Amino acid sequence: ATYCKNIGVKYLTVYAFSTENWKRSETEVSAIMALLKKYLLEAVDTMERDHIRLHFFGDMTPIAPELRALAHETDEITEHLSKDDFQANVCLNYGGRDEILRAVRRFAAECAEGKRKPEDLDETLFSTYLDSAGIPDPELIIRPSGEQRLSNFLLWQCAYSEFYYTDTLWPDFDEEELDKAIAAYQSRDRRFGGVKK
């Protein structure tokens, strides 16, 4: 996150744990959660100093109370930081389909309460119900480990994202690899559905 901030990236979103990852072995899930706890403890100590905001995407209800408390603590620190500071988004117990369903349920509940009408809904309003509300859609999605699939990641938000695939495994994905991905992205002509000029 610090390197991204230093080279001028404004937002970074990482897929830490998906809704499907609960299907992994208990040992593997425990190891991932232990790593997350370590990361969050470090974040609590360094966020203010480094001016790094932290935001979570996903349904936090099944997450262990200790991790939820740490996430809440990072939320409180983020509240005191400038909106202009770098922001790291962590997808935790996140799935793109689940995010869309949760957004639809929130909108439907507001319709049932008379706060909204179905005809109010457009893309802009719908985006306010997503975990990523107020955050720009990603310009670049990097897929490491030789995989060439979305894996249920930011399904709504990636409509016009550029994709970069690499065989480099996630643990080995370093600053040099990130620089390669950014250089590849910068060489592209983004048309957002239009024609090349």
List each language-model region with its residue ranges:
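Flexible, compositionally biased loop and terminal segments
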Residues: 1-197
